[in-house]
């Protein structure tokens, strides 16, 4: 009888502790302010040759020397192909140049990082404890203040790898922010490639930890540039080439001169003639060349595959990996998984917001 009474009391105490302890913990950790912490997931981040070396350089390196050498060899080979209607030499040479340029940057055939390239900042929050800085402490009416406020909880990631794997890491980061701030939910702001990471996260983990989501410069539904490139489609437009050169070429003497020549040529309609020359064979050559080139660079990035819209994904996959499906089985499995669990369900998922 005494034993039964003892067990009854003991079990009652155990149950009491099991019920009260979590409640006490929640009460202790919960912040009662109205400022829900914001986690910022931006777009592409720099990739360094050796993420553990603070003196490492960013890759790939588009040096003047490399571009001059490539142009010197590729232009006559393309012209030869145009005259002979045989672009096999051009395809081989262009693929070799891209492989050389991206040898330390590209992923392997399983879509995994094969070396120590990356960004050390992605691991900071795991090694240095987060602090509670979620309450507004900057003048957000100024550009600098708004910037500092936004970057308080700044999630960084390798912009090449599988978005679904990154989403798992983001989930851990969200839990860490919740714990240190005392809030049960967070706000998520995604920009550019970051909108793909948020989409993968929401598809896997839902809205339980999320108070609100903002998609800025969203590309999670795909981009025309990626749709065309991953399907071997290429068209040269004079205004587009002029704009690209102005925005992306450097400020060295060579590049400055090149930009001025391109802009002047465009104004005099000379660039249109050059583009017409390329477009006469460009469509056919692009389809013949691009799949090999893409497998030597950006085509190995699962995250970049996520920028292909759902309605063009299967066509792109079958084009890029035609004849080498077994060789790239690991990578194909990753991009198929994203398409099946995230990409093909984006419209219905966001309609439920």
State each model region's role.
Residues 1-10:
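Bacterial N-terminal signal peptides that target proteins for export
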Residues 19-32:
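Sec-dependent signal peptide cleavage junction
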Residues 29-189, 195-245:
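N-terminal non-catalytic accessory region
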Residues 43-103, 108-109, 218-353:
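Helical cap/lid subdomain of alpha/beta-hydrolase-fold lipid enzymes
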């Amino acid at each position: 009888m005494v034993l039964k009474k003892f067990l009854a009391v003991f079990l009652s105490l155990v149950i009491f502790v099991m019920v009260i302890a979590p409640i006490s913990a929640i009460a202790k950790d919960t912040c009662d302010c109205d400022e829900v912490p914001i986690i910022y997931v931006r777009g592409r981040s720099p990739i360094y040759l050796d993420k553990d070396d603070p003196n490492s350089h960013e890759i790939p390196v588009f040096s003047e020397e490399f571009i001059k050498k490539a142009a010197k060899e590729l232009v006559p080979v393309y012209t030869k192909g145009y005259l002979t209607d045989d672009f096999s030499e051009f395809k081989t040479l262009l693929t070799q140049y891209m492989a050389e340029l991206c040898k330390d940057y590209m992923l392997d055939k399983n879509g995994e990082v094969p070396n120590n390239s990356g960004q050390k900042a992605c691991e900071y929050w795991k090694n240095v404890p987060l602090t509670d800085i979620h309450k507004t402490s900057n003048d957000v009416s100024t550009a600098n203040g708004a910037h500092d406020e936004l970057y308080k909880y700044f999630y960084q990631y390798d912009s090449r790898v599988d978005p679904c794997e990154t989403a798992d890491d983001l989930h851990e980061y969200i839990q860490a922010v919740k714990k240190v701030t005392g809030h049960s939910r967070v706000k998520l702001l995604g920009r550019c490639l970051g909108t793909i990471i948020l989409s993968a996260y929401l598809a896997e983990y839902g809205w339980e930890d999320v108070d609100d989501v903002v998609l800025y410069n969203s590309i999670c539904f795909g981009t025309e540039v990626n749709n065309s490139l991953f399907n071997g489609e290429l068209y040269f437009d004079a205004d587009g080439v002029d704009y690209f050169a102005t925005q992306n070429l450097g400020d060295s003497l060579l590049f400055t001169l090149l930009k001025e020549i391109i802009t002047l040529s465009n104004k005099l309609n000379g660039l249109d003639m050059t583009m017409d020359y390329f477009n006469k064979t460009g469509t056919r050559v692009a389809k013949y060349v691009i799949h090999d080139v893409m497998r030597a660079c950006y085509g190995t990035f699962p995250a970049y595959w996520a920028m292909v819209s759902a309605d063009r994904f299967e066509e792109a996959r079958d084009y890029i990996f035609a004849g080498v499906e077994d060789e790239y089985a690991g990578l194909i499995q990753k991009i198929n998984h994203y398409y099946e669990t995230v990409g093909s369900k984006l419209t219905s998922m966001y309609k439920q917001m």
